[in-house]
Amino acid sequence: MLLRIYEENPNEKAIEQVVQVLKKGGIIIYPTDTVYGLGCDITNSKAIEKIARLRGIKPEKANFSFICYDLSHISDYIKPIDNTTFRVLKKALPGPFTFIFNASNRVPKLLSSQKKTVGIRVPDNLIARCIVKELGNPIVSTSIHDDDDIIEYSTDPELIYEKYKDQVDLVIDGGYGDNVASTVVSCFDGEFEIIREGKGDLAEFL
């Protein structure tokens, strides 16, 4: 199903429709402030395994990120951070960053990498954040952007739908997406290291 939602004013009934799909173990494709994402409810292990199969990888090696609503949401899934790190996050989020932290015990074992780390996103996109807020917990997410694919697949929701309609339960048309992924930043011991350059410029917030 292709569902149109306008970011400027997301329709509550449409958001609830998406949340019901997620609660039933469904897989969705949804807009962010960067490329479109492929996601499911963090509490549904079968849905997580399905996404991993779609990507052809094992869940524990998938480098999924958690889409959170705000900073308070983040704190449930990472180990305590220092004040410097918190101040940077407060300035940078919502925004086009994936921050890598040490994972807390609340991270499902299925998603715990050998390094015991987790990637956290608070996208500057009202549709994604409204879904997470209504759901009550994060979305486990991975990008559908593929360097081997024609670039339009990651930006045009109708093309995305045509490609993935038989593999996912719902595609949200939130308008054209970006074709630049998030900037990935590791955050350990108060130090920030750019792992992947992307849309976000962390220097603005340091």
Task: Put a short name on every predicted segment.
Residues 1-206:
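Active-site-adjacent structural elements in enzyme catalytic cores
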